[in-house]
């Protein structure tokens, strides 16, 4: 039960709040708002902020673009009620300057309150990363009605597999960069107990990483079912790999078409996937399974982190809002060699990854193509954007096969301010 674990959080959470309302009420009823979040005790510094300001002159990430010396001076002594500081938020971006041609985010949250206590930095980073979405004035919309999707079956001569994923965080527990071992184990316990209530085609079982052989783990990784140990410097610098593989694992249904990763980059990653090009069926299963998981979580006195400005709260600002990434593995041997390919993707608000995901190379001209944005558009809108965009890429590939010319599409409109 939530109330049992809450006592162990008293050193990190507001003991008075827990004592007054109880952990169950806290988990079920805490609505995050700027006027209700107070920072923790100010940090005592030996040197002035100007002496502590990081050298960001060669950095190419959103954090570095927005963190001025003045903002650093105003925020560097603040902390969330958990004690999470600005320097902890930005350390991964300081340590990892980014790629000259690929702009990363460069910062993470340690808890739900991070986005409020350090809003002066997070808000402009969010606006830059999410195509102009202004968290100060805009509200996020959720829509999990899969019946609204149109033209959701791709030509399988090009599309090899389809996948939709999102992340969800358990309210009242710190996010992976900041969580204690006890909190991480509680995330696992709460989630697995809820997942055991799934029935029908969603029913399955949980597999702990610590109980798998290396061969079993590698096979699941090779089949694109399981996450690998975080070895990326941006993840390790953020503290994602601490205590590995304690309290990490994968839950999947019997058909391995509905999966939940536990305690990787986020508390949970919910995934619907299958071979072939039936994105509409993948999204329908995703919506149905996600709604059922949330219902089962709430039955146990917990809930997901959410607010109307930022949508669902996750570790990286790039995943706020829907947290949704709808993607395909697609063969594009001709288009991928065309100099216009990057601009086409940019205008369609799509991103390209290697066959094995982020930081991997494309194998046999197979790319992982997915939506770039997460926030400010609903799940239905983003999946439809991917469907329309992937169909455009397929049309370009067909035209190139016939020796015909292709054109760069008009950019997807940015948000209105």
From Swiss-Prot:
It comes from the Eukaryota. Residues 158-400 form the Phosphagen kinase C-terminal domain. Keywords: ATP-binding, Kinase, Membrane, Mitochondrion, Mitochondrion inner membrane, Nucleotide-binding, Transferase, Transit peptide. Mitochondrial creatine kinase binds cardiolipin. Belongs to the ATP:guanido phosphotransferase family. It is an enzyme of class 2 (transferase). GO terms for molecular function: ATP binding; creatine kinase activity. The keyword Mitochondrion applies. It is found in: Mitochondrion inner membrane. Exists as an octamer composed of four MTCK homodimers. It catalyses: creatine + ATP = N-phosphocreatine + ADP + H(+). This is Creatine kinase U-type, mitochondrial.
């Amino acid at each position: 039960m939530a109330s049992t674990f809450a006592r162990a959080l008293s050193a990190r959470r507001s003991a008075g709040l827990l004592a007054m309302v109880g952990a169950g009420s806290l988990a079920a009823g805490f609505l995050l708002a700027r006027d209700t979040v107070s920072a923790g005790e100010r940090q005592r510094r030996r040197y002035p902020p100007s002496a502590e300001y990081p050298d960001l002159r060669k950095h190419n990430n959103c954090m570095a673009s927005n963190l001025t010396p003045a903002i650093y001076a105003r925020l560097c002594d603040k902390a969330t009620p958990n004690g999470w500081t600005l320097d902890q938020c930005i350390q991964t971006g300081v340590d990892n300057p980014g790629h000259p041609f690929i702009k990363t985010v460069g910062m993470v949250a340690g808890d739900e309150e991070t986005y409020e206590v350090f809003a002066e930095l997070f808000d402009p980073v969010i606006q830059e990363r999410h195509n102009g979405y202004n968290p100060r004035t805009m509200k996020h919309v959720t829509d999990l009605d899969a019946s609204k999707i149109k033209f959701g079956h791709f030509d399988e001569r090009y599309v090899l597999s389809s996948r939709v994923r999102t992340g969800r965080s358990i309210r009242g527990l710190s996010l992976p960069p900041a969580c204690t071992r006890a909190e991480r184990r509680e995330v696992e316990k709460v989630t697995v107990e809820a997942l055991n209530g799934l029935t029908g085609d969603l029913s399955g079982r949980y597999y702990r990483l610590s109980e798998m052989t290396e061969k079993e783990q590698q096979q699941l990784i090779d089949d694109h079912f399981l996450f690998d140990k975080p070895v990326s410097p941006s993840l390790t610098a953020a503290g994602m790999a601490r205590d590995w593989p304690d309290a990490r694992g994968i839950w999947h249904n019997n058909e391995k078409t509905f999966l939940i990763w536990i305690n990787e980059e986020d508390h949970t990653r919910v995934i619907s996937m299958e071979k072939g090009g039936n994105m509409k069926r993948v999204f329908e299963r995703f919506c149905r399974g996600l709604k059922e998981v949330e219902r089962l979580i709430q039955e146990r006195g917990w809930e997901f982190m959410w607010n109307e400005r930022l949508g669902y709260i996750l570790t990286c600002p790039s995943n706020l809002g829907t947290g949704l990434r709808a993607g395909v593995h697609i063969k594009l041997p001709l288009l991928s060699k065309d100099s216009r390919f990057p601009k086409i993707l940019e205008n369609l608000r799509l991103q390209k990854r290697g066959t094995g995901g982020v930081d991997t190379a494309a194998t046999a001209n197979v790319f992982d193509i997915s939506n770039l944005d997460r926030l400010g558009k609903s799940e239905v809108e983003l999946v439809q954007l991917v469907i329309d965009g992937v169909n455009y890429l397929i049309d370009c590939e067909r035209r190139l096969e016939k020796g015909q010319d292709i054109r760069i599409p008009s950019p997807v409109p940015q948000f209105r301010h």
